[in-house]
Amino acid sequence: MGSTTSSQKFIARNRAPRVQIEYDVELYGAEKKVQLPFVMGVMADLAGKPAEPQAAVADRKFLEIDVDNFDARLKAMKPRVAFNVPNVLTGEGNLSLDITFESMDDFSPAAVARKVDSLNKLLEARTQLANLLTYMDGKTGAEEMIMKAIKDPALLQALASAPKPKDDEPQA
């Protein structure tokens, strides 16, 4: 089964729905089973703190939401949070957060960190350190060279001010 075919649609095609409401009716002396469709509507304010005011409840329409259109519906809804949290990074003041979500992936800790400037810098540093660790794995003497560069401020400054290699230039 490909990624475009969901398992929920497979179940819907191959198995009867779980909720079946049926009752026996007597029509003109004959008993007949009648099935009632089960339709459920949920009303919820999922936008959090919307940037623009929402329509009145009476003016809102029901939307069909399924696995295929969930991210599009979420993006159209523009769920948003805005609040202040204590700044535990520097220990001074509060951080003002204002985050708008567009897909389910935006709720992951890394995606939230990318939307907060001070956390994004830490996340980038963590990613670069993880890349460095992967690069150094199995290279003899690499750890000693890194420790030597960290302990020698003059060497560290020279390495930081050295021109970076250009990856854009075509090689002959």
From Swiss-Prot:
InterPro entries: T6SS_TssB1 (IPR008312). Disruption phenotype: Deletion mutant shows a clear reduction in E. coli killing. It holds the Pfam family T6SS_VipA. Core component of the H1 type VI (H1-T6SS) secretion system that plays a role in the release of toxins targeting both eukaryotic and prokaryotic species. Forms the sheath of the structure by assembling into tubules together with TssC1 resulting in the stacking of cogwheel-like structures showing predominantly a 12-fold symmetry. The sheath contracts to provide the energy needed for effector delivery. NCBIfam families: VI_chp_5. Forms a heterodimer with TssC1. Heterodimers assemble to form the sheath of the T6SS machinery. Interacts with TagJ. Interacts with TssA1. This is Type VI secretion system sheath protein TssB1. It comes from Pseudomonas aeruginosa (strain ATCC 15692 / DSM 22644 / CIP 104116 / JCM 14847 / LMG 12228 / 1C / PRS 101 / PAO1). The lineage of its organism: Bacteria, Pseudomonadati, Pseudomonadota, Gammaproteobacteria, Pseudomonadales. The gene is tssB1.
